[in-house]
Curated annotation (Swiss-Prot):
SUPFAM superfamilies: Translation proteins SH3-like domain (SSF50104). Disulfide bonds: none annotated. One of its GO terms (biological process) is translation. Pfam families: KOW (PF00467), Ribosomal_L14e (PF01929). Keywords: Ribonucleoprotein, Ribosomal protein. This is Large ribosomal subunit protein eL14.
Amino acid sequence: MVKANYIRAGRLVRILRGPRQNRVGVIVDIVDANRVLVENPCEQKMWRHVQNLKNVEPLKFCVSISRNCSTKALKEALESKKVLEKYAATKVRRPHRAKKAFAESTDFERYQLRVAKRSRAYWARKIFDENDKKNPVSWHKVALKKLLKNAKKVDSTPAAKKRVEKARAARKARLAAGKSKTKVAASKK
């Protein structure tokens, strides 16, 4: 379904680029087919200014105002509908808030965040591994369990035991031959 957030007076928009990036404003008036007049009296840097439509993202929230209304009327309309609070609670706003908080944090706060993430990952992994030992859910544990079950069936016959012992003896012989070759090579140097 197509988003029907049409450009009109009263529509909330988010600025995409520039010094006011990720700030929210309200369309006060439409200048022409490419530009609109945007303002947000509740925010300090969002005084009335012209924005290109390529630089704004229309949001689903809208307030009922007349075109080119006063700042006072716009502020009253925003406060009565509480659209800024509704927008702040949306999923779209969450990453912007997190990014802003991270940018404003100090070096030590970022360090604390990294340590907390590591700790959380360690404990989550530890709990998962403990539970995985009791009741395997990870694919490699389940596959290993199946393999061991099938191996027990195959290894129980006397012929299989003989083959396993023969393979072990051959491996030991190879290792011994490899060690003797390295000793000979070392003595030639």
